[in-house]
C-alpha cells in the first residue's frame, strides 16, 4: 500500500486534535449522563457485573476478575481507573446509595487506600439491579464496544433517579460537574408530583426535595444556596459537621459525630491539632479518634476554663468542620451535549427517559406476547383436531409436506405449523390441552393490557409512578443531612473573640497588623528598644494606635477618605511580622497615604465627632453617624483645597473639649472644639491656625478644658518633653499659637504631640522599625519654653516615625 502524506498546519492539527480529545473526555469519561446518572466507566462496570452474573444474591467474585472483564470487553483503559470507580461505588461514605457490595478493604473515611484488587471481592447491590432492570427487553439502545466484537448499552434503563440520588463529580477539559446526592424518598415524591403536574415550578418541587442529603450527614446552613442550585444549576452551600458539647469528669469536651461530605476524618483531626497550636483562642488540650463500627466519634478535650462555644465556632472557621459545597449540575443530555441543568430539567430528562424505557419495554412485551399467542393459537387449533393432525403427519412423506398440509387443513401459518410439528406428544393430554387454552387466554388479556398501555401516554406515566413508589417502599430511608432554616453561618464575634488589648500599626507602604499589647515590653527612658515590626529602608511605621480586638480601626488618608476596618479581621501576629497590605481589607487608592489611625466601637458613635486637621491648617468636625455606612472603597471625609492634604485626625466626644495642634516648627495652638461648628461629611472645614512661612501642621490632640494631664512632644532625633496642659492657654481658632519647643536645629523637627498622664505609657516607633515602650512618669515635667530631653537612643541612620499612648481597655 503506497504511503500517503498529508500536509497540514500544525496549528490546525492541534486545534482539531485537542477538540476531539476534549469532547472525548467530556462525553466519554468525566461527565455523567442525565438519564442514568452514570459516567461511562461506571455504566460499563455494572453491565460487566451483570454479564458475570454478579447479582446481589449470588456469590462474590474477585475485583480483579471484574476489572479484567470490563477492561477486556468494554473499557480498554487503565485497570486502576476502573478499580477506583468500582471502589467508589462500594463506599458508603462516598455514595448515598452504594451500587456495589464490597468484601474486604474498600478504603475508609480517613482516605485510607483500598486493598489491591486481587484481595477484594464484589457483587452488585440490589439497587444496582434496578438500574439494569429490563435491559434485555430492548429498552435502551445497544452500541458496539470499542472493537466492534460485542455490544453494550448506551445508557441503562435506570428505574431509580441515580443522578440526583447519588450525585456525581468530575473534571473534564474546560468544564466540571459537582452534583450533590439526595434522599431517594424525596426524589420519588417530587417526580411523582411533576408527573401529576408537569407545570409544577421549581419552588413547588422544593416542597418535596428539601435539599442535598449527604451520606456523611452534617448540616446545610440555610436554603439560599440550595434554591439557587435548583433554579440555575449552580449554587454554594455551607455544610457543617455535627458536634455536641459534653461535660465529663476531666472537663468540657466537644464530640463530633458527623463531618461534611468529602472531608477526610484523619485530615480534619490533623487540622484541629494544627489550629490548636497556631490559633491562641482555640484552647484544645487533646484530640482523639474514638470511631468504631457503631459510627464516627471524634473527641476534643478542652483546656480548663475554655468556652466550648467559642472553640467550636473557631473550629468551624479554621478547619474543615465547616466547608462549602459548590454545586455545578453539568450533565450530558440525550443528544450527547454537555448542558447545565436545573432541578426541573433533570427531573424532566429522567421522566422522558423512563417514558421511552417503559414504552419500549411494553412494545417488546407486546411483540413477544403476540408471537407466543400466535403459536398458542395454532397449538390450540391442533389440540381440537388431534386425530386429523396425526393422520396428516403420518400420511406426509416429510416434514415440509406435513407443514404444508397442516397449514392448508387447519388454516394456520407456517410458524404455527412448525410449532405443532415440534410439539411433544405429552402436550396432547387433556391436562396439557387445558393449560394451553388457559395460557392462551391469559396472553390475550396481557396483549389487551399492553395495547391499552400504549394507547394513552397517561398509562405509561402511571406505570412510571408506580415503579418509583415501589422503589421508595423498598429502598427509601430517612434523611441524614439536616438543613438549618436561618442559614446564619456567621457567629457573634463577641462570643468567640476576646476583647484583648492590641496595638495596630500601619507602615508607610500600607502594611497593617495587630499585635497583642503584652508583646511590647517595658523599658526605661533612653533604652534602645526591641524590634516591633519587620521593615526595610524604604518602609517604616507611620501610625500606631492602642485599641482592642472588638473595636474598629478608622484609617484616615491624605486624600480625606475614611476607611473602617474591624480589628478582629486584622492579622493578629507578632512584633516582627510585617502584616498585610491595607488593600487586603479596604480598597485604598495607590496615591493615598495613611495619615491617622483611630479606634472606635460601633455602638459608641452616637455622641462622637470626627475631627480632621489638614497640613495647611484647615480643620473640620463631622458627626460619626455620617460614616456608619462606610464601604470597603472608603467614604469621603473632607473636601481638600488644591495642594492640601490631611495630616491628622481625632475623635471628639464633647463640645467642652479643646484641641491642641502642633506644627513641624514647634508651634502649638489650643482652642475649644465648640469653635468648630459641625459640618457635613464632604465639607472643606474652617481655618484652624495661621501658619508662618513653610510651616505645616504635624498633629492634633483633643483634651478637656481643665486637664491635669501633660502634652508629650517628640522630635525626629528622639528628643521629647512633657509639659502640663495648663501651660497652653486656650486661644481663638485661627490664631498663630505659641512656641512649644526650642533647639529644633539640634533635635530635628517635631514628629507629633500626645496627651498623657503620669500613669500612661508611650510607644515610640522609629523609621527602621524599632519600638520602645516608655512610662510617661520617667520623663520629668518641664515648662512650655524648654528644649526637652533624650527619650530614645537612636542609631545614626534612624529617626522617630510615630508615637502613641498605650491606653487602658476601658478608655478605648
UniProtKB/Swiss-Prot annotation:
Role, per record? A type II topoisomerase that negatively supercoils closed circular double-stranded (ds) DNA in an ATP-dependent manner to modulate DNA topology and maintain chromosomes in an underwound state. Negative supercoiling favors strand separation, and DNA replication, transcription, recombination and repair, all of which involve strand separation. Also able to catalyze the interconversion of other topological isomers of dsDNA rings, including catenanes and knotted rings. Type II topoisomerases break and join 2 DNA strands simultaneously in an ATP-dependent manner.
> Which coarse location class applies to the principal site listed for this UniProt protein?
cytoplasm
Topo IIA-type catalytic domain boundaries: 31-496
Compartments where located: Cytoplasm
Q: Which reaction does it catalyse?
A: ATP-dependent breakage, passage and rejoining of double-stranded DNA
Q: Which InterPro entries match?
A: GyrA, GyrA/parC_rep, Gyrase/topoIV_suA_C, Topo_IIA-like_dom_sf, Topo_IIA_A/C_ab, Topo_IIA_A_a_sf, Topo_IIA_dom_A, Type_II_DNA_Topoisomerases
Q: What disulfide bonds does the UniProt entry report for this chain? A: none
Sorted alphabetically, the Gene Ontology BP terms of this entry are: DNA topological change; DNA-templated DNA replication
Matching PROSITE patterns: TOPO_IIA
Q: What else is known?
A: Few gyrases are as efficient as E.coli at forming negative supercoils. Not all organisms have 2 type II topoisomerases; in organisms with a single type II topoisomerase this enzyme also has to decatenate newly replicated chromosomes.
Q: What is this protein called?
A: DNA gyrase subunit A
Active site feature: 119 (o-(5'-phospho-dna)-tyrosine intermediate)
Motif GyrA-box in this chain = 523-529
Q: Which UniProt keywords apply?
A: ATP-binding, Cytoplasm, DNA-binding, Isomerase, Nucleotide-binding, Topoisomerase
Q: Which GO terms describe its molecular function?
A: ATP binding; DNA binding; DNA negative supercoiling activity
- What is the protein's species of origin? Kosmotoga olearia (strain ATCC BAA-1733 / DSM 21960 / TBF 19.5.1)
Quote the subunit structure annotation.
Heterotetramer, composed of two GyrA and two GyrB chains. In the heterotetramer, GyrA contains the active site tyrosine that forms a transient covalent intermediate with DNA, while GyrB binds cofactors and catalyzes ATP hydrolysis.
This enzyme's EC code(s): 5.6.2.2
The GO cellular component terms are:
chromosome; cytoplasm; DNA topoisomerase type II (double strand cut, ATP-hydrolyzing) complex
Family designation: Belongs to the type II topoisomerase GyrA/ParC subunit family.
The gene it comes from is: gyrA
Amino acid at each position: 500500500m503506497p504511503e500517503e502524506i498529508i500536509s497540514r498546519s500544525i496549528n490546525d492539527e492541534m486545534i482539531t486534535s485537542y477538540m476531539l480529545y476534549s469532547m472525548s473526555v467530556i462525553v466519554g469519561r468525566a461527565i455523567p449522563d442525565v438519564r442514568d446518572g452514570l459516567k461511562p466507566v461506571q455504566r460499563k462496570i455494572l453491565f460487566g457485573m451483570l454479564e458475570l452474573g454478579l447479582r446481589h444474591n449470588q456469590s462474590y467474585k474477585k475485583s480483579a476478575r471484574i476489572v479484567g472483564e470490563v477492561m477486556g470487553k468494554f473499557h480498554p483503559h487503565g485497570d486502576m481507573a476502573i478499580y477506583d470507580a468500582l471502589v467508589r461505588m462500594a463506599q458508603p461514605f462516598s455514595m448515598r446509595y452504594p451500587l456495589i457490595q464490597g468484601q474486604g478493604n474498600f478504603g475508609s473515611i480517613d482516605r485510607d487506600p483500598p486493598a489491591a484488587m486481587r484481595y477484594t471481592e464484589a457483587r452488585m447491590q440490589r439497587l444496582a439491579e434496578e438500574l439494569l432492570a429490563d435491559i434485555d427487553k430492548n429498552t435502551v439502545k445497544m452500541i458496539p464496544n470499542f472493537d466492534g466484537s460485542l455490544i453494550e448499552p448506551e445508557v441503562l434503563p435506570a428505574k431509580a433517579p441515580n443522578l440526583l440520588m447519588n450525585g456525581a463529580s468530575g473534571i473534564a477539559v474546560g468544564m466540571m460537574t459537582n452534583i450533590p446526592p439526595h434522599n431517594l424518598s424525596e426524589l420519588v415524591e417530587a417526580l411523582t408530583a411533576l408527573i401529576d403536574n408537569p407545570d409544577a415550578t421549581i419552588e413547588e418541587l422544593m416542597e418535596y426535595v428539601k435539599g442535598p442529603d449527604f451520606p456523611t450527614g452534617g448540616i446545610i446552613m440555610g436554603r439560599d444556596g440550595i434554591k439557587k442550585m435548583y433554579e440555575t444549576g449552580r449554587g454554594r452551600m455551607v455544610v457543617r459537621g455535627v458536634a455536641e458539647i459534653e461535660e465529663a469528669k476531666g472537663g468540657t469536651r466537644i464530640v463530633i459525630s458527623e463531618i461534611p461530605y468529602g472531608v477526610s476524618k484523619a485530615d480534619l483531626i490533623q487540622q484541629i491539632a494544627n489550629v490548636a497550636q497556631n490559633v491562641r483562642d482555640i484552647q484544645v488540650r487533646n484530640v482523639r479518634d474514638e470511631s468504631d463500627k457503631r459510627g464516627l466519634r471524634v473527641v476534643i478535650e478542652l483546656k480548663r476554663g475554655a468556652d466550648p462555644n467559642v472553640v467550636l465556632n473557631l473550629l468551624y472557621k479554621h478547619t474543615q468542620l465547616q466547608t462549602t459545597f459548590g454545586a455545578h449540575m453539568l450533565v450530558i443530555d440525550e443528544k450527547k451535549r454537555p448542558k447545565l441543568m436545573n432541578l426541573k430539567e433533570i427531573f424532566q430528562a429522567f421522566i422522558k427517559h423512563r417514558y421511552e424505557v417503559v414504552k419500549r419495554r411494553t412494545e417488546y412485551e407486546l411483540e413477544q406476547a403476540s408471537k407466543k399467542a400466535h403459536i398458542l393459537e395454532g397449538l390450540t387449533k391442533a389440540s381440537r383436531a388431534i386425530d386429523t393432525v396425526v393422520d396428516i403427519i403420518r400420511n406426509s412423506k416429510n416434514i415440509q409436506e406435513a407443514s404444508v398440509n397442516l397449514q392448508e387443513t387447519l388454516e394456520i401459518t407456517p410458524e404455527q405449523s412448525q410449532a405443532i410439528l415440534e410439539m411433544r406428544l405429552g402436550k396432547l393430554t387433556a391436562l396439557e390441552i387445558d393449560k394451553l387454552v388457559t395460557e392462551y387466554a391469559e396472553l390475550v388479556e396481557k396483549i389487551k393490557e399492553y395495547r391499552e398501555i400504549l394507547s394513552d401516554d397517561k398509562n405509561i406515566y402511571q406505570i412510571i409512578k408506580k415503579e418509583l413508589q415501589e422503589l421508595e417502599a423498598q429502598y427509601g430511608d430517612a434523611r441524614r443531612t439536616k438543613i438549618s432554616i436561618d442559614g446564619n453561618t456567621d457567629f457573634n464575634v463577641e462570643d468567640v473573640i476576646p476583647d484583648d488589648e492590641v496595638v495596630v500599626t500601619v507602615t508607610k507602604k500600607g502594611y497593617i497588623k495587630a499585635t497583642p499589647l503584652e508583646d511590647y515590653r517595658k523599658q526605661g527612658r533612653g533604652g534602645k528598644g526591641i524590634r516591633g515590626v519587620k521593615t526595610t529602608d524604604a518602609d517604616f511605621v507611620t501610625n500606631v494606635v492602642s485599641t482592642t480586638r472588638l473595636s474598629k480601626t478608622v484609617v484616615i488618608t491624605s486624600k480625606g477618605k475614611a476607611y473602617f476596618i474591624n480589628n478582629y479581621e486584622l492579622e493578629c501576629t507578632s512584633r516582627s511580622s510585617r502584616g498585610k497590605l491595607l488593600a487586603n481589607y479596604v480598597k485604598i487608592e495607590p496615591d493615598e497615604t495613611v495619615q491617622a489611625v483611630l479606634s472606635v466601637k460601633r455602638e459608641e458613635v452616637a455622641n462622637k465627632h470626627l475631627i480632621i486637621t489638614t497640613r495647611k491648617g484647615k480643620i473640620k468636625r463631622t458627626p460619626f453617624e455620617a460614616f456608619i455606612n462606610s464601604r470597603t472603597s472608603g467614604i469621603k471625609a473632607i473636601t481638600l483645597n488644591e495642594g492640601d492634604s490631611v495630616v491628622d485626625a481625632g475623635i471628639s466626644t464633647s463640645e467642652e473639649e479643646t484641641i491642641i495642634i502642633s506644627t513641624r516648627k514647634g508651634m502649638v495652638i489650643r482652642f475649644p472644639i465648640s469653635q468648630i461648628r459641625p459640618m457635613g461629611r464632604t465639607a472643606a472645614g474652617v481655618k484652624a491656625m495661621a501658619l508662618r512661612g513653610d510651616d505645616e501642621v504635624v498633629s492634633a490632640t483633643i483634651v478637656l478644658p481643665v486637664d491635669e494631664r501633660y502634652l508629650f512632644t517628640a522630635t525626629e532625633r528622639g528628643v521629647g518633653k512633657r509639659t502640663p496642659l495648663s501651660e497652653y492657654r486656650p486661644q481663638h481658632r485661627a490664631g498663630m499659637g505659641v512656641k512649644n519647643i526650642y533647639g529644633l536645629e539640634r533635635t530635628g523637627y517635631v514628629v507629633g504631640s500626645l496627651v498623657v498622664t503620669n500613669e500612661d505609657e508611650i510607644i515610640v516607633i522609629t523609621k527602621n522599625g524599632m519600638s520602645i515602650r516608655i512610662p510617661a512618669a520617667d520623663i520629668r515635667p518641664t515648662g512650655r519654653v524648654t528644649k526637652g530631653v533624650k527619650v530614645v537612643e537612636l542609631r545614626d541612620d534612624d529617626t522617630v516615625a510615630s508615637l502613641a499612648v498605650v491606653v487602658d481597655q476601658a478608655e478605648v
